[in-house]
């Protein structure tokens, strides 16, 4: 019987390097750091690989995903697998089971989940996972206990035979309730039977450490390509901003911080050279950018938009070597022993809102580095990249390519 995995993901957080925290002298901090540092490199490599696969499939479209959320959802799913299916899934996520046990992998994700869930008062964030199982199947209690322990998740039973009037409404109602109405209508229908659905939901609203000037936002042109121009509200701030004109890649970038752990890289490739920059994306590139950014006087223009992406990852994961899940060879015997399951869909949705709000009052939007210096003007009015990371966990929370923000 086919298994349908749906993942709805809405994430926004921030950035950092993958090794620096080992230098912190505080023992408790280092102990916690060890857990999420283990995941950082693995998750980052998976993130860039998945992102590049999606970009290749949609060369002229927006691409926006929450990589760490996808890794977490698939790692959670692996708790229900056995044998070659389990080994292939974890290997596809980047783990070497001869170096790191399955228990250690899930313990690391457990710490990561806890850290991401502990947002400060300046953030509004709701995140969670849930599994919906066909009520005709008997769930193994050990699986339910494991996903509760490691991922704070739960399994709910539904009547999937009555999808239109019962199952879809119950799932949508569950997510709407958990996110206080921020995520609605996760499902509208299925074109094939389902016995198991996995959802992963996140709502995030952050505030900039340095806000954009509300009074300066105005409609401007965004040049999608040589023949397409759209109108977007363009935000503005002027002040001391971390900036880099890359000497190795054809791009400029700035780094902006949210209150709390969030940080965002906005990357502006030269016209026609977007693919060169995307091909070079890696942990080493991010480390080099982080080291090269310098405080500069910048006049910054960024679209005020909602960026989103929704994908069925089935074919992409198969291309990346995670194929057993979708065949009759799939082994989900740690979820139920009542039926032979296989995965039919992996659905992911990510949404990010860019707005002016910050922790400071709007008026003077920045600190001037040198009143006599001519500011660098960065206007994101053509296709650009956005990358959102978390300072504390070094997690890749959003990777995006914005071709048309309208």
UniProtKB/Swiss-Prot annotation:
> Which CDD domains does the entry mention?
serpinA6_CBG
Tissues in which the UniProt entry reports expression: Expressed by the liver; secreted in plasma.
Q: List the disulfide bonds.
A: none
Tell me the keywords, alphabetical order: Glycoprotein, Lipid-binding, Secreted, Signal, Steroid-binding, Transport
Q: Where is this site: Conserved cysteine within steroid binding domain?
A: 251
Localisation per UniProt entry:
Secreted
Q: Which SMART domains does UniProt cross-reference here? A: SERPIN
An example GO CC term for this entry is: extracellular space
GO molecular-function term, one example from the UniProt record: steroid binding
- Residues involved in cortisol binding: 255, 287, 394
| Carbohydrate attachment residues | 31, 96, 261, 331, 360
Q: Which residues form the signal peptide?
A: 1-22
What does the comment on domains in this protein's record state? Proteolytic cleavage leads to an important conformation change. This reduces the affinity for steroids.
Q: What does this protein do?
A: Major transport protein for glucocorticoids and progestins in the blood of almost all vertebrate species.
Name the protein family.
Answer: Belongs to the serpin family.
**What PANTHER family does the record point to?**
CORTICOSTEROID-BINDING GLOBULIN (PTHR11461:SF34), SERINE PROTEASE INHIBITOR, SERPIN (PTHR11461)
Name under which the protein is recorded: Corticosteroid-binding globulin
